[in-house]
Amino acid sequence: MNYLPIFIDIKQKPCLVVGGGSIAYRKINLLLKAYGQVTCIAKSSCKNVAKLVNNKKIIYIERSFESSDVNGQVLIISATNNATLNKKVSELASQNNIPVNVIDSPDLCTFIMPSIVDRSPILIAISSAGKAPVLARIIRAKLESTLPHAYGKLAELAGNFRDQVKAKFSRIEDKRYFWEEIFSGIIAEKVFSGKIQEAKADLQAQLNNTVEAQVGAVYLVGGGPGDPDLLTFRALRLMQQADVVLYDRLVSDRVMELVRRDAQLIYVGKECDNHAVPQGDINQLLVDLAKEGRRVCRLKGGDPFIFGRGGEEIETLAENGIPFQVVPGITAASGCSTYSGIPLTHRDYSQSCRFVTGHLKDGSMNLPWHELAIEQQTIVFYMALNSVEYLSGQLIIHNMRPDMPVALVEKGTTPEQKVYITTLKELPNLVENETIHAPTLIIIGEVVKLREKLNWFDAKPISSKK
């Protein structure tokens, strides 16, 4: 190691920043976050520094730096574009044994400022020892995207119970095991969901041994349309900590690769007239697994509340007193249209959009066809590949133009995506003559014409215009 990573307590202690520009402002903000008493010395200041002065957050001295300014300081940062001045500040600080940092000059520093992931009281510092600051910032960004902001609240909760845990467990191993269970379990998830008081009560009950049988939890997670990059941070976190994953046919293989490696996987996918597990059995299985104390991820393609029967599943959970949370996902209509270069609404072509299922409860398609056939709107059909002849006929009967543009998006947002462009009249012929597989989304409306201009993701569409 070129540097020893340490954390310095500057709370209510005098810190000096030389310079009043935008870089100085960023450093001042860091010092203020650590409750340092900041003095800024510069001939002029930027608007943000001036605002701090007006709000009495810092002391500002409008003049050139003088040698005596280092007296009494516990930490100094020089953030000017004057190399001679920066060197002078560094030398004076070093002579007085005061830690000093000079921006973009590692050779003049006795300490360097890392990139910081702040989940106070949890702090993560990333440094490249001054070799590649941009790389350190990229690493920081990756960490920012994976660590919930509520980790700080979890640490504070643990701190409040630290003495009780020390009193209860004499062996270090027992303490460690207890905290590992807390930090990776349901109590932590309650903190992440903002249920601090519930988490506090559960932790206290666990310490008091009043929890007879720890009930698990169910995470109803939207897996998006296929591209794993479209998962939310929360979805990914819950997928990676679940003990059991119940997944659908529409969840892509690349999304499934991100679930916890040692989790039990249970396939409960459905196809037309072929349900691997009936919906009622799925609902009960979620209850049974949670009652065993397991963390269950119910992973669905798209969004669980848009034609995903998620509402039915959590109704059963609520009736049985099972804790659950729902994580929205990017629905297929949004993902597939975006990756096809087809905006669902457009000022010139469509002022509204309707999502319609082509697979109704009783097997019929008893839809408000006269409403669907009006102009200036986009219709998106889910699960309608086997019903294209009927839906095409009904829309034409209800006065939608036979030449209305139609797009079929097969396996949208994935590397296997295919987009077929046709018209409402020719839609049945296209499906009959081409080998098109589910999942396929059908988009109907003038906005489909924009694909030729706005397509960004895949190759040219397969067309069947006649």
UniProtKB/Swiss-Prot annotation:
**Region called Uroporphyrinogen-III C-methyltransferase, residue ranges:** 216-466
Residue positions annotated to bind S-adenosyl-L-methionine are P225, G301, G302, D303, I306, T331, A332, M383, G412
Any idea of its EC number?
A: 2.1.1.107, 1.3.1.76, 4.99.1.4
Presence of the UniProt keyword Cytoplasm in the record: no
- Carries keyword Lyase? yes
Record's Gene3D superfamilies?
Cobalt-precorrin-4 Transmethylase, Domain 1, Methyltransferase, Cobalt-precorrin-4 Transmethylase, Domain 2, NAD(P)-binding Rossmann-like Domain, Sirohaem synthase, dimerisation domain, Siroheme synthase, domain 2
Residue positions, PTM Phosphoserine = S128
Query: Known catalysed reaction(s)?
Result: uroporphyrinogen III + 2 S-adenosyl-L-methionine = precorrin-2 + 2 S-adenosyl-L-homocysteine + H(+); precorrin-2 + NAD(+) = sirohydrochlorin + NADH + 2 H(+); siroheme + 2 H(+) = sirohydrochlorin + Fe(2+)
What GO biological process, any one, is recorded here?
A: siroheme biosynthetic process
Q: Show the active-site residues.
A: D248, K270
Q: What segment(s) does the record annotate as region Precorrin-2 dehydrogenase /sirohydrochlorin ferrochelatase?
A: 1-203
Q: In which pathway does it act?
A: Cofactor biosynthesis; adenosylcobalamin biosynthesis; precorrin-2 from uroporphyrinogen III: step 1/1; Cofactor biosynthesis; adenosylcobalamin biosynthesis; sirohydrochlorin from precorrin-2: step 1/1; Porphyrin-containing compound metabolism; siroheme biosynthesis; precorrin-2 from uroporphyrinogen III: step 1/1; Porphyrin-containing compound metabolism; siroheme biosynthesis; siroheme from sirohydrochlorin: step 1/1
Q: Which PROSITE patterns match?
A: SUMT_2
Question: Which InterPro entries did the record assign?
Answer: 4pyrrol_Mease, 4pyrrol_Methylase_sf, 4pyrrole_Mease_sub1, 4pyrrole_Mease_sub2, CobA/CysG_C, NAD(P)-bd_dom_sf, Siro_Cobalamin_biosynth, Sirohaem_synt_dimer_dom_sf
Keywords noted in UniProt = Cobalamin biosynthesis, Lyase, Methyltransferase, Multifunctional enzyme, NAD, Oxidoreductase, Phosphoprotein, Porphyrin biosynthesis, S-adenosyl-L-methionine, Transferase
Q: Which GO terms describe its molecular function?
A: NAD binding; precorrin-2 dehydrogenase activity; sirohydrochlorin ferrochelatase activity; uroporphyrin-III C-methyltransferase activity
Where NAD(+) binds, per the record, is at S22, I23, K43, S44
**Pfam families annotated for this entry?**
CysG_dimeriser, NAD_binding_7, Sirohm_synth_M, TP_methylase
Q: Which family does it belong to?
A: In the N-terminal section; belongs to the precorrin-2 dehydrogenase / sirohydrochlorin ferrochelatase family.
Q: What does this protein do?
A: Then it catalyzes the NAD-dependent ring dehydrogenation of precorrin-2 to yield sirohydrochlorin. Finally, it catalyzes the ferrochelation of sirohydrochlorin to yield siroheme.
Per its record, how is this protein called by name?
Siroheme synthase
Q: Which organism is it from?
A: Vesicomyosocius okutanii subsp. Calyptogena okutanii (strain HA)
